[in-house]
């Protein structure tokens, strides 16, 4: 009888363990279902945004509203969005066209849009996409750059006509500098970020200098990419803000390492 009781107890324990495993499996399945199901639903929403942008290509007022709504959605987006059919290419084409890139082929005729607000929200959307991209999609920044984003953003810093847009561009560059610093350096992005540094507030200055410090880690293909910005960085070394000075020091250290002959300093 004692052995029978032990056997019964063991069977009950095994059944309890199986029940727990089944419960865990069900919870995991439900969790994955919410993730992928939610991702598909969110992707459908962004495909609707893409269609709305295409349909509003020649309606600046309507297009601005769509861009504002898209920016709001992306500002709270999580990595789940990218697990479905997120229309990355289509959205980037529309956003970059708003910033001044070539007309998308989806537009039957050419149109012009000189709205600074539209450009601001388009750039903001790109920044949010870079922020929301999950580790499982490691090439989002590269995809963004493949569309000619960096040269286009540089032109916005070279011809500052809308301060809010320039500040947003610097934030975008700070995100890109973590993964695509070499492309920024080759395009002359360091000088573009620093040439009007004193024109911005302290927080934007910190963003610009942080981005340049990331870019300074890259060995430049041409020394002029560094020598053009050395006078500005040298001036920043004398600023009173500790974070700006720290970024400037990082720049100098990286350049001395990458250019041991002292070609830049």
Residues covered by each model-derived region:
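Acidic, Ser/Thr-interspersed intrinsically disordered low-complexity regions
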Residues: 2-28
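Regulatory, intrinsically disordered low-complexity regions in eukaryotic nuclear proteins
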Residues: 29-33
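Long amphipathic alpha-helical scaffold regions
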Residues: 206-212, 234-237
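Elongated alpha-helical scaffolds that mediate protein-protein interactions in large eukaryotic proteins
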Residues: 34-44, 51-65, 69, 73-121, ...
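Alpha-helical solenoid cores of large eukaryotic proteins
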Residues: 69-73, 125, 129, 172, ...
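Register-specific detector for alpha-helical tandem repeat solenoids, activating on a conserved position
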Residues: 96, 127, 151-154, 170, ...
């Amino acid at each position: 009888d004692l052995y029978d009781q032990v056997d019964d107890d063991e069977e009950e324990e095994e059944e309890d363990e199986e029940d727990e495993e089944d419960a865990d499996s069900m919870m995991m399945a439900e969790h994955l279902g919410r993730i992928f199901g939610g991702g598909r639903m969110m992707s459908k929403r962004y495909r609707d945004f893409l269609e709305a942008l295409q349909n509003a290509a020649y309606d600046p007022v309507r297009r601005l509203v769509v861009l504002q709504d898209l920016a709001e959605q992306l500002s709270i987006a999580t990595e789940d969005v990218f697990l479905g059919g997120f229309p990355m290419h289509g959205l980037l084409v529309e956003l970059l066209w708003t910033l001044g890139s070539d007309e998308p082929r989806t537009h039957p005729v050419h149109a012009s849009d000189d709205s600074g607000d539209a450009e601001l929200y388009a750039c903001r959307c790109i920044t949010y996409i870079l922020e929301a991209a999950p580790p499982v999609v490691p090439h989002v920044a590269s995809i963004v750059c493949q569309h000619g984003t960096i040269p286009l953003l540089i032109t916005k810093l070279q011809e500052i006509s809308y301060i809010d847009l320039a500040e947003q561009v610097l934030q975008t560059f700070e995100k890109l500098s973590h993964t695509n610093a070499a492309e920024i350096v080759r395009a002359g992005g360091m000088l573009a970020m620093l040439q009007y540094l004193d024109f911005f507030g302290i927080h934007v200055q910190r963003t610009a200098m942080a981005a340049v410090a990331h870019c300074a880690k890259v060995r430049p293909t041409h020394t002029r990419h560094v020598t053009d910005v050395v006078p500005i960085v040298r001036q920043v070394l004398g600023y009173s803000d500790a974070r700006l000075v720290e970024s400037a020091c990082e720049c100098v250290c990286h350049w001395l390492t990458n250019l041991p002959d002292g070609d830049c300093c």
